[in-house]
């Protein structure tokens, strides 16, 4: 069964973007390819339990098992050795991607304190959008009482758009709340 956002994309957003951006083929209309959720856990070097807690939270809110990210270089300033676990990330595609994006737009972002919208300047020039979240407790799956420490995360939405303008139009139609 397709998610609500995927049905909206195919039935409503694709025809609107096709007309709005004057494409010659319906296949040129940009689509969301994947969403990458990255959580950096700097204090995982001293206490591995913090990494396990972050991994379980990431698994709850994404619906799949995260990959542990390891340090590429040794840095004495951070007491870090090459190969040490320093974070976790999840790549979402397909139905889970649409479900997560729907949850992010309609449930999580409105729960952020003093939320005025996500930045319009968070595009990378190639049609990808990245935003940061300061607290994981905005997601309903994360139990506030079991949270050891408030952690942030980076959410990257990778699209097939060639320019920032196309990606902005796509995400605006999807319902991403951009700042005024």
From Swiss-Prot:
- What InterPro entries does the entry give? Ribosomal_uL5, Ribosomal_uL5_bac-type, Ribosomal_uL5_C, Ribosomal_uL5_CS, Ribosomal_uL5_dom_sf, Ribosomal_uL5_N
Q: Looking at the Swiss-Prot or TrEMBL record, what is one Pfam family this protein matches?
A: Ribosomal_L5_C
What keywords are assigned to this protein? Ribonucleoprotein, Ribosomal protein, RNA-binding, rRNA-binding, tRNA-binding
- Please indicate if the UniProt record lists Cell inner membrane as a keyword: no
- Supply one GO BP term: translation
Q: Name one GO cellular component term.
A: ribonucleoprotein complex
Give TM regions.
none
The answer to whether the entry has keyword rRNA-binding is yes
Q: Which residues form a coiled coil?
A: none
Q: Which GO terms describe its molecular function?
A: rRNA binding; structural constituent of ribosome; tRNA binding
Q: Which family does it belong to?
A: Belongs to the universal ribosomal protein uL5 family.
PANTHER family found in the cross-reference section: 60S RIBOSOMAL PROTEIN L11-RELATED
Biological role stated in the UniProt entry: This is one of the proteins that bind and probably mediate the attachment of the 5S RNA into the large ribosomal subunit, where it forms part of the central protuberance. In the 70S ribosome it contacts protein S13 of the 30S subunit (bridge B1b), connecting the 2 subunits; this bridge is implicated in subunit movement. Contacts the P site tRNA; the 5S rRNA and some of its associated proteins might help stabilize positioning of ribosome-bound tRNAs.
- Fill in the subunit field for this protein: Part of the 50S ribosomal subunit; part of the 5S rRNA/L5/L18/L25 subcomplex. Contacts the 5S rRNA and the P site tRNA. Forms a bridge to the 30S subunit in the 70S ribosome.
Q: What is this protein called?
A: Large ribosomal subunit protein uL5
Question: Which organism encodes this protein?
Answer: Mycoplasma mycoides subsp. mycoides SC (strain CCUG 32753 / NCTC 10114 / PG1)
Q: What's the gene? A: rplE
């Amino acid at each position: 069964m397709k998610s609500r956002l995927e049905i909206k994309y195919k039935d409503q957003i694709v025809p609107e973007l096709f007309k709005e951006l004057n494409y010659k083929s319906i296949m040129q209309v940009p689509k969301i390819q994947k969403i990458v959720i990255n959580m950096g856990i700097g204090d995982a070097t001293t206490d591995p339990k913090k990494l396990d807690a972050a991994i379980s939270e990431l698994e709850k809110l994404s619906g799949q098992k995260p990959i542990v990210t390891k340090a590429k270089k040794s840095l004495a300033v951070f007491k870090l050795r090459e190969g040490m676990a320093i974070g976790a990330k999840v790549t979402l595609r397909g139905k889970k991607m649409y479900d997560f994006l729907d949850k992010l737009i309609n449930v999580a972002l409105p729960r952020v304190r003093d939320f005025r919208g996500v930045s319009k300047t968070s595009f990378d020039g190639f049609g990808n959008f990245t935003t940061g979240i300061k607290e994981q407790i905005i997601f309903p799956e994360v139990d506030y009482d079991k949270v050891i420490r408030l952690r942030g995360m980076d959410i990257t939405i990778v699209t097939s758009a060639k320019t920032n303008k196309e990606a902005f139009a796509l995400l605006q139609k999807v319902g991403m709340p951009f700042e005024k």
